[in-house]
Amino acid sequence: MSKSENLYSAARELIPGGVNSPVRAFTGVGGTPLFIEKADGAYLYDVDGKAYIDYVGSWGPMVLGHNHPAIRNAVIEAAERGLSFGAPTEMEVKMAELVTNLVPTMDMVRMVNSGTEATMSAIRLARGFTGRDKIIKFEGCYHGHADCLLVKAGSGALTLGQPNSPGVPADFAKHTLTCTYNDLASVRAAFEQYPQEIACIIVEPVAGNMNCVPPLPEFLPGLRALCDEFGALLIIDEVMTGFRVALAGAQDYYGVVPDLTCLGKIIGGGMPVGAFGGRRDVMDALAPTGPVYQAGTLSGNPIAMAAGFACLNEVAQPGIHETLDELTTRLAEGLLEAAEEANIPLVVNHVGGMFGIFFTDAESVTCYQDVMACDVERFKRFFHLMLEEGVYLAPSAFEAGFMSVAHSMDDINNTIDAARRVFAKL
């Protein structure tokens, strides 16, 4: 047995499923998950000594690559002054100033410890600010594991949501309306059925949890218009897209102004950080200045703030996003060319430093139904063959891939060459 197999066997006796987040268990592709020893730049190194070109990037945060010296040094320096104080620090102020400067729609920001905390708190704030209970989310979009968000669509277009996890009371789920991503008609229908009851829409501007599905040109502006028409708030969940699709996020890339924004992943530079913020009048409703409660023992933790501050300063340097786009575009084009040579039907979506690989005969993938029609079994074979080639992709057909500026053009070309060999075997 390999060392990864031995560790996984031991882990399953001690940790549910052997992992601390379900997708890591390789249940979406089968087999034994890799246990990682270290990472540097664009590469992961497993406990058995094998290196992989990494397109998971810790599920998004590693836009600069692994073990970036500016972030590592910032963490070391901060740790020498203490790990946590439970009191305000200067770095919290500097971090808030940096974030609000980089994302102009955020007049104020509150730091938390995860993307789930950010979305959960933003929804509570929207409900408290509007005095309404219902929310709209989209089928196939993921916003963390808060009870109100673990909800799937009912049996009809306008039925109330149903829990998609045991432990979520139906009474919670009934306040969550699930609409179709990239379909404004389904959203209007929900508002027309509940015109005075919907507090907010929460949306991934690029749906990254049904692989990578960009918005149609009219979709995000249409959501903004519907929120204005019916008095609801628009929450854009940029946990995945923030500072990756563009410096000011996908909202800037697509030209839409939200009321609230949720951030995570890159904002922590690899440390556990989330944030939410937006309009000053809405944020003023948050405790201690307002009645909507939110708190956190480790929120604004000095180590995490130092890592995030260092990361964002690096990400804000000229040329970063142009490089991300160039690398991702080359990868997407190369994969499509290699698939065509092997007569493999393939769609590759990409925006900025995100991409998605779909084995499908369709010309495009624009919604959850399109994603579900893809050939998952072929993806599983593709994943394992690429792993044998030393390329680490997300171990699920429903998760986006992530580029970093640490990837070289040689890494990209080697990945395309590996895919060409793999396509010949599919």
Swiss-Prot record:
Cofactor(s) essential for the protein: pyridoxal 5'-phosphate
InterPro entries for the chain: 4pyrrol_synth_GluAld_NH2Trfase, Aminotrans_3, Aminotrans_3_PPA_site, PyrdxlP-dep_Trfase, PyrdxlP-dep_Trfase_major, PyrdxlP-dep_Trfase_small
UniProt-recorded Gene Ontology molecular function terms: glutamate-1-semialdehyde 2,1-aminomutase activity; pyridoxal phosphate binding; transaminase activity
Main localization, broad class: cytoplasm
Enzyme Commission number(s): 5.4.3.8
Subcellular location, record wording: Cytoplasm
GO cellular component entries: cytoplasm
SUPFAM superfamilies: PLP-dependent transferases
Pathways per UniProt: Porphyrin-containing compound metabolism; protoporphyrin-IX biosynthesis; 5-aminolevulinate from L-glutamyl-tRNA(Glu): step 2/2
SS bond list: none
Top-level taxonomic group: Bacteria
GO terms (BP aspect): protoporphyrinogen IX biosynthetic process
Keywords from the named record: Cytoplasm, Isomerase, Porphyrin biosynthesis, Pyridoxal phosphate
Catalytically driven reaction(s): (S)-4-amino-5-oxopentanoate = 5-aminolevulinate
Similarity remark: Belongs to the class-III pyridoxal-phosphate-dependent aminotransferase family. HemL subfamily.
Subunit description: Homodimer.
Name by which UniProt lists this protein: Glutamate-1-semialdehyde 2,1-aminomutase
Species this protein is from: Salmonella schwarzengrund (strain CVM19633)
Lineage: Bacteria, Pseudomonadati, Pseudomonadota, Gammaproteobacteria, Enterobacterales
